[in-house]
Amino acid sequence: MSSTAAFCLLSTLGGYLVTSFLLLKYPALLHQRKKQRFLSRHISHRGGAGENLENTMAAFQHAVTIGTDMLELDCHITKDEQVVVSHDANLKRSTGVNVNVSDLKYCELPPYLCKLDVPFQRACKCEGTDTRIPLLKEVFEAFPETPINIDIKVNNNVLIQKVSELVKQYKREHLTVWGNASSEIVDKCYKENSDIPILFSLQRVLLILGLFFTGLLPFVPIREQFFEIPMPSIILKLKEPHIISKGHKFLIWLSDTLLMRKALFDHLTARGIQVYIWVLNEEHEYKRAFDLGATGVMTDYPTKLKEFLNNMSA
C-alpha cells in the first residue's frame, strides 16, 4: 500500500472515529430527541412480587400507594378472549393446577396459591390473600394515571389486538409501553398500534450492542423508546455458588461487562430512550444501576426501592 493510500485510509478512519465519538456524546446533532410522555425510576415487577402475590390487584394497589412510577405486568388471553394478567401460560407453578390459560374461560381460571416463590430472590417466598387472576381492564380502571409496562407473553394475534383495543378504550397510549423479548411479537405490536411505545426485543438489544461497539450506533435511527435489559451479574445470587461452573461464571461476567455500559446508557437517554434494568432487589444493585445512568430500576420489593430513592435524594 502506498503512503498516499495509507494516509487516506487513516484520515478516513480518524474522521469516522471522531464523528462517531462526537455523535455518541451529542446525538441531538443528528437525531431528534424522542418525546418522553412519562419518566419512570421506580418500577414494580409484577406489582412487587416480593411484597404481595405477583400480578394481583393487591400487589398493584400496594405499589401505587407507596408511589411507584410504573407497574410491570404480563398478559395472556383466555379461551373466551379475555386479557388476563398472568406471567405463565401454564398455571402449574402459580396455582398448582396443570392447565393452560388459553384452554380455559376466564371464570374457570383457578386462583393463585397463597404462597409463591419470589422469582428473582433465591429461597424467598411471598404470601398473600388476594389470589384472583385479574383482567387487564381492571388494572387500567383502577390506576388510570399510572404508567404500565406490558409484557405480551405469547405470539397471539388476538391477544395483541385485544390489548391494543383496551389501551385505546381507556385512552392510555401515552401511559403504556408494550413488547416482548421476541422480535416477531414486538413487530406485531408496532404494526397493530404504533401510538403505543415499544420495548427493544432481544434481537434488537444485541443489534444495539453490536452497533455500539463498532461505533455505528450514533448514525442509526431507533424506533423503540424503552431499552429494558437484565443485569447479568444477579444470576450469581440466584443459584448456589458451587453449582455454577467456571465457564458459566465467565459468560455471566462477559455478558455483564458488555451490557452494563454507562456510555451506552448515556447515549440512549440523550436520545430520549429510557433505560430500565431488571430485576434488582438489593441496594447495591440499585446503586450500580443508577450510577451507570439507568433511567429506572425494576424490583420485586417496591418498598425497599422507594426507601433507597428517598435516601438518595435526601
Curated annotation (Swiss-Prot):
GO molecular function annotations of the record: lysophospholipase activity; metal ion binding; phosphoric diester hydrolase activity
Entry-linked InterPro entries: GDPD-Related, GP_PDE_dom, PLC-like_Pdiesterase_TIM-brl
Binding site for a divalent metal cation: E72, D74, H87
Transmembrane annotation, as ranges: 4-24, 196-216
Main location: cytoplasm
Ranges of the Extracellular topological domain: 1-3, 217-314
Record keyword Cytoplasm present: yes
Catalysed reactions, as listed in the record: a 1-O-alkyl-sn-glycero-3-phosphocholine + H2O = a 1-O-alkyl-sn-glycero-3-phosphate + choline + H(+); 1-hexadecanoyl-sn-glycero-3-phosphocholine + H2O = 1-hexadecanoyl-sn-glycero-3-phosphate + choline + H(+); 1-hexadecanoyl-sn-glycero-3-phosphoethanolamine + H2O = 1-hexadecanoyl-sn-glycero-3-phosphate + ethanolamine + H(+); N-hexadecanoyl-sn-glycero-3-phosphoethanolamine + H2O = N-hexadecanoylethanolamine + sn-glycerol 3-phosphate + H(+)
Cellular compartments per GO CC: endoplasmic reticulum; endoplasmic reticulum membrane; membrane; perinuclear region of cytoplasm
GO biological process: one example: glycerophospholipid catabolic process
Hydrolase keyword on record: yes
Keyword annotations from UniProtKB, A to Z: Cytoplasm, Endoplasmic reticulum, Hydrolase, Lipid metabolism, Membrane, Metal-binding, Transmembrane, Transmembrane helix
Name this polypeptide is given: Lysophospholipase D GDPD1
Annotated organism of origin: Rattus norvegicus (Rat)
Gene label: Gdpd1
